[in-house]
Structures are given as structure tokens and as C-alpha cells.
């Protein structure tokens, strides 16, 4: 289902129509010049019948909160010395001296 159909449904509800019909949604989509798939609109209207938008959003938020976020936990590495050695090498490198401002001029002058 395309987001434009859900958006048109939410727009109709925000305008005060608590139970928009397929024709109401088609009018909204036609006003912006969008193509309309009537089967998709009918499926949306059927799935939202008897429910309010606020109840549907609250149910979705509850489902999202119950999902784990961040993926699975990684197992601890067996050899813990490898990352420390990499950090030592990074610290051993000295940052190169940044070029002077005059060297970066490349012949361009702001006031020429």
C-alpha cells in the first residue's frame, strides 16, 4: 500500500471526516493529480472500518516498543589483545603538519 493512500486517509480524518469513503479519498488524490488504485483504497477503508486513527497509531506504537532495537548482541571476542594493539599503532602515528595558509592559496585572491 502506498503512503499516499494512508496520507489521504489521515488528511480526511484531520479535516473532520472520521470515516472517509473510497470516494472521499479519490477526491483528495485527484485534487493533487495522483493516480488512484481503487483496490488499494478499498483495502485501506476496509481495514480501518470500526477503528479510529488514534487507536491504530497507539496499537502500532505498542508493537514498535515491543520490538528489539539495535540488533542482536555480539558475543565477546576470545582474543582481547588485538584491538589494544591497533590503538597503540594509531597513537604512535604523529599527525602530519597542516600546510600553512599561504601554501593553500593556489594563486587565487579574494581581492584581485
Curated annotation (Swiss-Prot):
Residues 86-97 have a biased composition (Basic and acidic residues). CDD domains: Ribosomal_P2. GO terms for biological process: cytoplasmic translational elongation. Residues 69-112 are annotated as: Disordered. Residues 69-85 have a biased composition (Low complexity). The keyword Cell membrane does not apply. GO terms for molecular function: structural constituent of ribosome. InterPro entries: P1/P2_N_sf, Ribosomal_P1/P2, Ribosomal_P2. It comes from the Eukaryota. Phosphorylated. Keywords: Phosphoprotein, Ribonucleoprotein, Ribosomal protein. One of its GO terms (cellular component) is cytosolic large ribosomal subunit. P1 and P2 exist as dimers at the large ribosomal subunit. Plays an important role in the elongation step of protein synthesis. Belongs to the eukaryotic ribosomal protein P1/P2 family. This is Large ribosomal subunit protein P2. The lineage of its organism: Eukaryota, Sar, Alveolata, Apicomplexa, Aconoidasida.
